[in-house]
From Swiss-Prot:
One of its GO terms (molecular function) is ferrous iron binding. Belongs to the frataxin family. SMART domains: Frataxin_Cyay. It comes from Paracidovorax citrulli (strain AAC00-1) (Acidovorax citrulli). GO terms for biological process: iron-sulfur cluster assembly. This is Iron-sulfur cluster assembly protein CyaY. PANTHER family: FRATAXIN (PTHR16821), FRATAXIN, MITOCHONDRIAL (PTHR16821:SF2).
């Protein structure tokens, strides 16, 4: 994958995260604050915990840091998959955001 292809796919992921936060805020009382700065999105929860998602362009990876730990994802077969085999990005974001918010939240690629 070229750098340009990576950036195209990664931008779609970051946009889906931002739109997911907006949708969640419109339909729940979660009160997520999503801030975008270049290739990074920081989601802050009312309890002040955060999830940080950022691009690692040289590695063609997306990194996510949450209270549960740090995770690295690569695009494989159209999905962002954990480099250690621990699942897919949006499933992990859903899991960690739900834990950190204390309520069920759902993120998806679309």
């Amino acid at each position: 994958m070229t750098d340009t292809e990576f950036l195209d796919h990664a931008e779609k992921l970051l946009l889906a995260v931002e739109q997911g936060c907006d949708r969640i805020n419109d339909t729940t009382d979660a009160d997520l604050d999503a801030q975008r700065s270049g290739g990074m999105v920081t989601i802050t929860f009312p309890n002040r915990s955060q999830i940080v998602i950022n691009l690692q362009k040289p590695l063609h990876e997306i990194w996510m840091a949450a209270q549960s730990g740090g995770y690295h994802y690569r695009l494989e077969d159209g999905a962002w998959k954990d480099t250690k085999g621990d699942g897919e990005f949006f499933a992990a974001l859903t899991r960690d955001a739900s834990r950190q918010s204390g309520m069920p939240l759902v993120f998806s690629a679309s």
